[in-house]
Amino acid sequence: MWLPRVSSTAVTALLLAQTFLLLFLVSRPGPSSPAGGEARVHVLVLSSWRSGSSFVGQLFNQHPDVFYLMEPAWHVWTTLSQGSAATLHMAVRDLVRSVFLCDMDVFDAYLPWRRNLSDLFQWAVSRALCSPPACSAFPRGAISSEAVCKPLCARQSFTLAREACRSYSHVVLKEVRFFNLQVLYPLLSDPALNLRIVHLVRDPRAVLRSREQTAKALARDNGIVLGTNGTWVEADPGLRVVREVCRSHVRIAEAATLKPPPFLRGRYRLVRFEDLAREPLAEIRALYAFTGLSLTPQLEAWIHNITHGSGPGARREAFKTSSRNALNVSQAWRHALPFAKIRRVQELCAGALQLLGYRPVYSEDEQRNLALDLVLPRGLNGFTWASSTASHPRN
């Protein structure tokens, strides 16, 4: 068999090229660390629409150590709106990974015209984008206000988002566009990330009541959830979207608690909105401890203010975090929904109610009786609420 002859000079050149390539790859800087040299912590607030996720996002956002973005994957879904939630999972995951690493070039595919911070979805709710080095509307450690930030920072360069992101010890993203946990496994096992998942759930009956108040705003997302190939869905009399949301919460919680992979240990925590509403400071301290943050006196005062307002909040504030009575918000559905609709939600979401610890009601009298507690104690049926304390449910 004839073999081509290769000169020793060519072999030497090839070996040198490989050596230089290896040295280049090894010497490339990895993801930047915040000041102090400690590894950056990445937190994903994983939830669904109308579940209190904007509120929980703000609990992280207002912390002085946090760079926060609200639903960056909104750009994926609005650009690729003819896709389905399942087909867009990988694009959403890849964008989330890039943002966690402060690589804002990932938005090129969705914002080719990007010039200013205001090109980002809900940019002004991010305290980090309203304070140095991104903007000077607020001192870095101050509680920010969207209304004040918008006119002052809208024309700031988009490139400042990366600079700001790299200056914080924690990057927190709130997302409502993941419908199973498995799609996140590559992020959880990625050595470049130090990921924690906060899985926020809410009583499906309360979710339905809130969704009905914001039906128009959710129409495009509903179509993607239902896989309608780009058709918006405002009216959903069959409650198909609510059913899919319930199923997704069950899939995620079961994947995290029944037989979780080793890389998930200590990285997942399930939180019920109702528990936050009842004991906000205790729950928030636990959340902060889980993610390596501490509660400051300034934050404690702010949290007390936004959870002890009057009433459930106006409809125009549906997508905003304002001062409200958190307990009233969590119970409002019991007065607002007809019993027939509640019974239907309970049928469609029976598995979620049982797994997540919500008691069904069997009559209108039970529905209206606020003395009847419908939020069951945590740990019912051996449910593991944080995989940092246990990796398997008890039998």
UniProtKB/Swiss-Prot annotation:
Lumenal side: 27-395
Protein name in UniProt: Carbohydrate sulfotransferase 6
A Pfam family assignment: Sulfotransfer_1
Cystine pairs: none
GO terms of biological process kind: carbohydrate metabolic process; keratan sulfate proteoglycan biosynthetic process; N-acetylglucosamine metabolic process; sulfur compound metabolic process
Function: Sulfotransferase that utilizes 3'-phospho-5'-adenylyl sulfate (PAPS) as sulfonate donor to catalyze the transfer of sulfate to position 6 of non-reducing N-acetylglucosamine (GlcNAc) residues of keratan. Cooperates with B4GALT4 galactosyltransferase and B3GNT7 N-acetylglucosaminyltransferase to construct and elongate the sulfated disaccharide unit [->3Galbeta1->4(6-sulfoGlcNAcbeta)1->] within keratan sulfate polymer. Involved in biosynthesis of keratan sulfate in cornea, with an impact on proteoglycan fibril organization and corneal transparency.
Catalysed reaction, written as an equation: 3'-phosphoadenylyl sulfate + keratan = adenosine 3',5'-bisphosphate + keratan 6'-sulfate
Organism expressing this protein natively: Homo sapiens
Subcellular localization: Golgi apparatus membrane
Gene: CHST6
Any single GO CC term annotated in Swiss-Prot or TrEMBL for this entry: Golgi apparatus
Residues passing through the membrane, by range: 6-26
